Amino acid sequence: MSKNIAVVCGSYHKKEIELMLELAKDQADKEGLTISQVVWVPGAMEVPLALNRIVNANGESLVGAACLGIIEKGQTQHGLAMGQAVLKSIIDLQLSWNKPIGLGIIGPGAEPEHIGPRLEPHARAAISAISSML
């Protein structure tokens, strides 16, 4: 039986997230998981809704999901507030579905120099988290 997962990707930093998605696919293969669905959303705020829709539509065929994105540091606390709200929503969804969600969101508060070095570890860790919780 295939262990299917979905991945939700924020498109605001599309170039970086496309790289993260390729790394996530490689890690999924190593972990014996199949990425059966990829959904692109505008940014981190849309991730919880997309996750909810995916699991509601495909829940029986999915063992988990991952999200990939970046929340940069801005000049206000908007990114921090947004990051906290998104993370809480993701945890709530994970608990209500009883399915693991791998968090591959860099930030909040990521400075430009923080992004590059974190792309691979965050992408791979998001997939490994799913595998370890099955």
Regions found by a protein language model. Give the residues of each.
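Short beta-strand segments at enzyme active-site cores
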Residues: 38, 63-68, 100-106
